[in-house]
Design a protein with these regions (language model features):
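A short acidic, helix-capping loop that chelates divalent metal ions and anchors anionic groups
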Residues: 27-28, 50-55, 126-128, 202-205
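Hydrophobic alpha-helical core bundles mediating ligand binding, dimerization, or RNAP-core interactions
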Residues: 25-28, 42-46, 66, 89-93, ...
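Short, acidic loop-to-helix structural element flanking the phosphoryl-transfer center
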Residues: 81-118, 128
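Alpha-helical elements of Rossmann-like donor-binding domains used by nucleotide-donor carbohydrate transfer enzymes
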Residues: 26-27, 68-72, 88, 104, ...
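Asp-based, Mg2+/Mn2+-dependent phosphohydrolase catalytic module
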Residues: 1-6, 119, 123-124, 128-225
C-alpha cells in the first residue's frame, strides 16, 4: 500500500498508458487489409527491438525503432509501401487517441500538489507532440526521455535518471504505467508502482505485485489521494 506522506512525485508512462497505441490501426486502414494484425505485430516488434537494443548496446531513438518495427510488420504481411507511405503511417504516433480519463485524473493529482512527469521510451520530439496532443502541458512539470541516457525501459538506470531529473528520492516517486514490464522495472529501481490494467489482463506470475492495480488514470489518482 502507498504511504501517502512519502509520495511527492508521479511519473507516467506514455504509450498504452496515456494514449491508445491500438489507434495505430487507423493509420494502417488505408494501406493494409488486416490493420489490427499489422498494428499488433508493429507494437510487439517495437518493444522487442527496445529490449534487444538494451542488451546489445545498439541504441537508436525510439522513433527509429518504431520505423524498423513497422517495416517488419508490413513485410510479414506481404505489404510493399513507399517510404513516404510508411512515414505517413508512422506519424500517427504524434496524434494517437488520448484516453478520456487522462486529463481528469492528472488534474486531480496536480491540484493536490503532486509534481507530474511523463517518463517514456519515446524520444523528445515524440513526447513534445504527445503532451501537446493530450492537452496536459499545463499539468506536467516536464518529460523525461530514454533518449537522455540512451537506455530503454525496463533498465533501472532510466528510473534512477528520472529520480535525478525530478530531484526526488526514488522511493518517493510513484510510477504509473500500463506495461507490466515497465511496472517491474520501476519497482526494481525502487519506485512505488501503479499498474494501469486497461484491458483486464492477468497479472504476471513472477516478480511480485505493484503497489496498486487500477483500470485508468482517474482511479490511479484516487489511490494516491
Amino acid at each position: 500500500m502507498f504511504d501517502l506522506d512519502e509520495v511527492t512525485t508521479v511519473t507516467f508512462d506514455s504509450y498504452g498508458t496515456l494514449v491508445d497505441v491500438d489507434d495505430a490501426e487507423r493509420a494502417l486502414a488505408d494501406y493494409v487489409e488486416t490493420p489490427e494484425s499489422v498494428s499488433r505485430l508493429w507494437r510487439t516488434r517495437s518493444l522487442e527491438y527496445s529490449f534487444l537494443a538494451g542488451q546489445i548496446d545498439a541504441y537508436e531513438p525510439f522513433y527509429e525503432l518504431n520505423r524498423h518495427a513497422l517495416q517488419y510488420a508490413l513485410d510479414s504481411h506481404g505489404v510493399d509501401l513507399s517510404a513516404d507511405e510508411r512515414d505517413e503511417i508512422l506519424s500517427v504516433y504524434h496524434e494517437l487517441d488520448v484516453f478520456d480519463d487522462v486529463r481528469p485524473g492528472m488534474e486531480r493529482l496536480h491540484e493536490a500538489g503532486y509534481d507530474l512527469y511523463v517518463l517514456s521510451n519515446g524520444n523528445p520530439e515524440m513526447l513534445d507532440s504527445l503532451v501537446d496532443h493530450a492537452d496536459i502541458e499545463d499539468l506536467v512539470e516536464d518529460t523525461i526521455s530514454a533518449d537522455e541516457i540512451r537506455q530503454f525501459k525496463p533498465a533501472a538506470d532510466l528510473y534512477r535518471h528520472a529520480a535525478g531529473r525530478t530531484g526526488t528520492p526514488i522511493d518517493r516517486i510513484a510510477h504509473v504505467a500500463g506495461g507490466q514490464f515497465d511496472v517491474m522495472g520501476a519497482d526494481h529501481a525502487g519506485m512505488r508502482t501503479v499498474w494501469v490494467n486497461r484491458d483486464d489482463s492477468p497479472p504476471e506470475p513472477f516478480d511480485g505485485e505493484p503497489d496498486a492495480t487500477v483500470a485508468d488514470i482517474e482511479t490511479a489518482a484516487e489511490k494516491l489521494l
